[in-house]
């Protein structure tokens, strides 16, 4: 009957082993790509969301170095979302500027057509 305590110890050890978070290397890569993409579309250090993303990415790297993988994953995920938000805001600003430019041209054309009649 000594098998039961040994079996329980093995099961407990297996559960503890599964509870450890793996290193979030893939998430860090995704986050780095998201930051690079936001920068590529025109986000700068003046964009608060990009600054937040970079700060969280730096913290995620520090957490990785300390082997605090759960914290690293959470920081990296948040940084990725912040970078994507910065990218979306920059693209929205560019789109709004293009719409305003088209509206200005349309107004000029309307005036020209009205003056020609």
At which residue positions do the language-model features occur?
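Bacterial N-terminal signal peptides that target proteins for export
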Residues: 1-7
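C-terminal motif of bacterial Sec signal peptides marking the signal peptidase cleavage site
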Residues: 14-17
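Bacterial signal peptide processing site
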Residues: 19-22
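Juxtamembrane extracytosolic/periplasmic "stalk" immediately C-terminal to the first targeting helix
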Residues: 27-35
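Post-signal-peptide N-terminal segment of Sec-exported extracytoplasmic proteins
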Residues: 36-78
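A contiguous, mid-protein "functional segment" used to position or interact
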Residues: 66-96
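Surface-exposed, polar helix/loop patches in the mature regions of secreted/periplasmic/lumenal proteins
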Residues: 85-117
């Amino acid at each position: 009957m000594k098998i039961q305590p040994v079996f329980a110890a093995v099961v407990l050890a297996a559960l503890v082993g599964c509870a450890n978070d793996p290193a979030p290397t893939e998430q860090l890569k995704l986050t780095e790509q998201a930051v690079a993409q936001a920068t590529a579309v025109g986000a700068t250090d003046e964009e608060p969301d990009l600054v937040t993303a970079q700060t969280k990415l730096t913290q995620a790297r520090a957490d990785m170095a300390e082997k605090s993988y759960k914290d690293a994953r959470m920081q990296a995920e948040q940084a990725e979302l912040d970078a994507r938000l910065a990218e979306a805001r920059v693209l929205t600003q560019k789109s709004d500027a293009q719409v305003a430019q088209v509206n200005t041209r349309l107004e000029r054309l309307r005036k020209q057509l009205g003056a020609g009649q």
